[in-house]
Swiss-Prot record:
GO cellular component terms given for this protein: host cell nucleus
Main location, first listed in the record: host cell
Annotated keywords: Host nucleus
Family label: Belongs to the alphaherpesvirinae HHV-1 UL4 family.
Lineage, highest ranks first: Viruses, Duplodnaviria, Heunggongvirae, Peploviricota, Herviviricetes
Name of the protein this chain belongs to: Nuclear protein UL4 homolog
Domain of life of the source: Viruses
Compartment(s) of residence: Host nucleus
Length: 225
């Protein structure tokens, strides 16, 4: 059996003061809407890490037959995720104290306020509920064959391709860089937003930190003019 390479990216949320609405359930589908008083988000990419405090807000978890989606809206901190399941087996989502949901995935999409990151990587999503009104959401992303990202201003998007060979042995090829002139979105403190942190501080796709601007994650956002 082929062994997996070590995880190269971790995204972890710790959300405190959780209040949950009654779960909405259908066959092979659950949805939970929650509010939180505060929390933090930690990103670890290789030897680099970044931690941000998240203010009061809300989040939604939708757990379906083939996709699990998360939407976190904490004011200036907004992001949504969609994970494509890697296995046919499915465990229902619950918010009972001490419950844990583990979802292996084979691809994921992450959308911020102004950019979208799409990866054909595999990994594991874990959602756990503590007994003290605390929720933990952890994403472990493994080395993917391809990473795709674009700024939602589609008129500025440019294209580059990261080959599997560059990922498996980046030292044998020159890194590929997209033109970053149109990719200047930053946090209010002058630092890069968390999606840019993932792109610039990792070698997920064998480019040693280049932002790869590819076709939109959602075709309806394309500018056809």
């Amino acid at each position: 059996m082929e062994t997996c390479s070590p995880p190269v990216t971790f995204i972890t949320y710790a959300l405190y003061g959780i209040k949950t609405s009654p779960a909405w359930t259908l066959p092979n589908f659950e949805q939970v809407i929650c509010s939180c008083d505060w929390g933090y988000r930690l990103i670890a990419v290789g030897a680099e890490s970044k931690c941000d405090v998240t203010p009061q807000g809300s989040f939604v978890i939708q757990h379906g037959a083939s996709i699990t989606a998360l939407v976190l809206d904490c004011g200036v901190e907004f992001c949504s995720y969609a994970f494509t399941h890697a296995e046919n087996t499915r465990v229902p989502l619950t918010t009972e104290d001490g419950s844990v949901l583990v979802v292996p995935f084979c691809g994921w999409v992450c959308v911020g306020r102004d950019r979208c990151l799409r990866s054909m990587s595999g990994g594991v999503l874990t959602i756990s509920w503590d007994t003290s009104q605390t929720a933990y959401i952890s994403v472990a992303v493994y080395r993917p064959p391809t990473l795709q990202c674009h700024a939602l201003d589609c008129t500025r998007a440019e294209t580059t391709v990261c080959s599997t060979a560059a990922i498996t042995d980046a030292s044998e090829s020159d890194p590929l860089y997209a033109d970053q002139e149109g990719d200047q979105t930053q946090d209010q403190d002058g630092g890069h937003d968390f999606l840019e942190t993932i792109l610039m501080e990792s070698d997920l796709y064998g480019t040693n930190g280049a932002s790869a601007l590819l076709e939109p994650c959602f075709p309806c956002l394309s500018n056809n003019d």
